[in-house]
Amino acid sequence: SFFELCGKTVLTVGCGSVGSECARRYKALGCRVLGVDLYPTENELYEKIYPLSVLPSILSVSDAVILTLPLTDETRGLFDGEMLSHMKNTAVLINISRGAVVDEDALTAALSEKKLYGAVLDVFESEPLSQDSPLWDMENVVITPHNSFVSEKIRSGCFP
């Protein structure tokens, strides 16, 4: 079934330039846009940007969670089984940041046990994703080949 974004609460984890561009698009689609960042500031694209320390409580009210944060010692494995357990079972996790931010085994378990509605994954702990990964066969997972940044505008700027 389809996942309608209009009217949903979208959480951007990592509110830098990439996260803010995502927020701009979600806002245009009629979403309530929240943010979580290591260094929260005010930004008109977000209803509010929260500190990382309150991430679990913000996950519990979010319908879609998009990860756009850098990989640091603080963010490595941030989305482990414990963190994923705070998400709604109707929520979608989107990872376009770094694969190691998400514990793939914990995510696979959450998806197979229907603790999450689905996931969109552009990055993985180890790339390319192993051919024997169960993620390939899950109907509630969309996998892209680490190219979420690709667009006609980017392409024309890189290859004039």
Residue ranges and their predicted role:
Residues 1-9, 21:
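Phosphate-binding beta-alpha-beta segment of Rossmann-like dinucleotide-binding domains, i.e.
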Residues 14-16:
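Glycine-rich Rossmann-fold phosphate-binding loop(s) that bind the pyrophosphate
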Residues 27-31, 160:
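Oxidoreductase and adenylate-handling cofactor-binding alpha/beta cores
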Residues 1, 127-160:
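C-terminal helix-to-coil terminal segments
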Residues 9, 31-32:
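Residues at the starts of beta-strands that form the adenosine-phosphate
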Residues 37:
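Conserved acidic E/D residue at the C-terminus of a beta-strand in Rossmann-like folds
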